[in-house]
């Protein structure tokens, strides 16, 4: 707890970063409880990291809405799991500099939200390739018929 006290000393706002795993969510819930007990902390938000939509779809990972409901904390961002982060870190280059990286875009959006801008959350289920986009468009068209 002393480490927590040192970390929040002088802070008036906080961002709780967690992953959609039960042990991490329990830890985040404990941190939120500690933040709520600090008069100096006027607001706090949740940043959900390492989100994998495929695992959410297969019910192997908790969904974003479920985590937000459990923690009762406003969401500031969703960062998808991205192997490009490992590569960029090893090169010493921030992922936010990669215009094509979904995680980089997600981090840029978080920064904009922190600055008070209204930015929609990324659709992490978006098809990646050209053919996938065409198939998705036809599937949507077929669903309307």
Where are these regions (language model features)?
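Conserved catalytic-core segment of NTP-binding enzymes
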Residues: 1-77, 81, 86-87
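Alpha-helical scaffold segments in soluble metabolic enzymes
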Residues: 6, 30, 106-109, 113
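Alpha-helical structural motif
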Residues: 81, 103-106, 130
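C-terminal boundary of histidine-terminating zinc-finger modules
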Residues: 91-106
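A short, charged, Gly/Pro-tolerant segment at domain boundaries
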Residues: 109, 113, 122-145
